[in-house]
Amino acid sequence: PYSGGTYSISKNGRYAITYGNVYNPSDLAVGYNGKMSRLTDLNKDLFDYKKLGNVEEVWYKSSFDGRDIHGWLVKPPNFDSSKKYPLILEIHGGPFSNYGFRFSAEVQLFASKGYLVLYTNPRGSTSYGKEFANLIHHNYPNQDYDDLMSGIDHLIKQPFVDKDNLFVTGGSGGGVLTAWIVGKTDRFNAAVVAKPVINWYSFVLYADNTNFYYKYWQPGPPWENLEHYMKRSPITYVGNVKTPTMLLTGENDYRTPMAESEQFYTGLKLNSVESMLIRIPGASHGIAARPSNLITKVNAITAWFDKYKK
């Protein structure tokens, strides 16, 4: 449920936009002089026969410093409050990005398979002001972990959450945090790390924008800041991992190259941790750009989680 969209404005002030909400993918709308009308309803036939999970806003306090953290909980279709459901923590990438009250096929697919899904905006997320976003400047990952764990702590107080069946996944920056999480806690039954950075030292030297990453995300080049790079790298904590962990990355991903996933996978195998590495042929960093890849990704993640349910 990332932010984003497309618009076009004419010289006379008329505009066209992509328009959607948490229960509808984007359609086309036009507007002028304070009025807007929707032109398309591309998924009406589908939604006449498919029921979506309800999406509810959640606020909670971070255990680190008491900051308010914003999130959303997606419930399975036909949710029954008298039952208990497994919970997936789904973490956004970026890390300077945000989730919101927007449609996500991936999240709804998780919910359709009987999972609660929590997605949040930990520190570093955009849309909450400059100060909040910059809390992770040269400090990522770190206290964003506390923000995420506080969300889990908040939700497991609800009687419909099965606290014995907790799972975690995320892609790109969310993959970084997922790998970080399993190096810091064993509370999750299983994890899926998608297209992550695992070793900041190697990443800044061969990813697709080397002139950017070491200047803005790090305090300088790695050979001058070895301790900092390794302290913030999930590979440093791979020896702590006991959580069954799947990794998946596109073979044509130049943003978070395959070798990042391979490093973590090898570390897990050397420590006899149950693990799997999925290489997605032809896929770039945008795995879901091909719809069949999105469906396969969700099926792989839920199959992994189903395997480790209690």
Q: Residue spans of the language-model regions?
A:
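Beta-strand C-termini and the immediately following turn/loop, strongest in propeller blades
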Residues: A16-V22, Y32, S62
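Conserved beta-propeller blade repeats
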Residues: P1-T18, D48-K51, E56-E57, G100, ...
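Glycine/Thr-rich phosphate-binding loops of Rossmann-like dinucleotide-binding domains
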Residues: P25-S26, N98-Y99, Y201, T256
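Beta-propeller blade-edge and WD-like acidic-aromatic loop motif
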Residues: Y23-L39
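Active-site-proximal cap/loop segments of hydrolase catalytic domains
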Residues: Y119-K310
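Conserved hydrophobic/aromatic positions in well-ordered beta-strands
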Residues: A29, W72-V74, I278
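Cap/lid segment of the alpha/beta-hydrolase catalytic domain
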Residues: G34, L42-D164, G171, F203-Y213
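Short flexible coil/turn linkers enriched for glycine and charged/polar residues
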Residues: N21-V22, D65-R67, G175
